[in-house]
Amino acid sequence: METLSYSQIKKRKADFDEDISKRARQLPVGEQLPLSRLLQYSDKQQLFTILLQCVEKHPDLARDIRGILPAPSMDTCVETLRKLLINLNDSFPYGGDKRGDYAFNRIREKYMAVLHALNDMVPCYLPPYSTCFEKNITFLDAATNVVHELPEFHNPNHNVYKSQAYYELTGAWLVVLRQLEDRPVVPLLPLEELEEHNKTSQNRMEEALNYLKQLQKNEPLVHERSHTFQQTNPQNNFHRHTNSMNIGNDNGMGWHSMHQYI
């Protein structure tokens, strides 16, 4: 076995170092953060804005995103409406006439935010998209209570928005109630609740109330039909529902017309 002297080892090391120095050094290049990191450090509002901009530029993305994102629960929708209503009430100026033009101009943006939210959410609880009568009624009841709490003003022009909301709620009510015409099992009709809604709205929901009264008048026929159905399907039970309802125009699509007002 060959034994290397110190001088030989030193020479070999020098030759090796010389080879390294002749190699092309790969230097780093500046670049932005990876997309995953950018998303991690972006706040929710930024991501929301970016997503909407991408959908506007690439409409096909909307279908894919709808297929991925889960629909919000009813509780979430109602909570959103309540928060918007709180923001509206908190935006009133301190002191002064809260029914005057100045007050309306101060709260107008928050007022419209409530209407826009209703405009987006109500159709999600109407057939044919939503066919569950009880769920539809529950949401419409909550939405009606929100409209009841919208402020009114001395200037009748400022009250057009609320009147239109009642009109649309009435139509949605009619659409949901008409689901019962073909149902073999009919839930308990919430007549008292709708009467209270109509009273609070100053008879602006009378059309839906009259329709519900007509349903109640035909209730013996309905129950006879239901009894026959139960005899052939004994496992089915009557659905009991004590909540209320409301919203829309004759064909249930009236919320689309809200855009001309807001």
From Swiss-Prot:
UniProt key word Nucleus: yes
Disulfide bridge positions per record: none
Post-translational modification note: The N-terminal part (residues 1 to 72) is polyubiquitinated by rhp6, which is required for the interaction with the proteasome.
UniProt cross-references to InterPro entries, sorted A to Z: Cut8/Sts1_fam, Cut8/Sts1_sf
Pfam family, one: Cut8
Major location (coarse): nucleus
Protein name per UniProt: Tethering factor for nuclear proteasome cut8
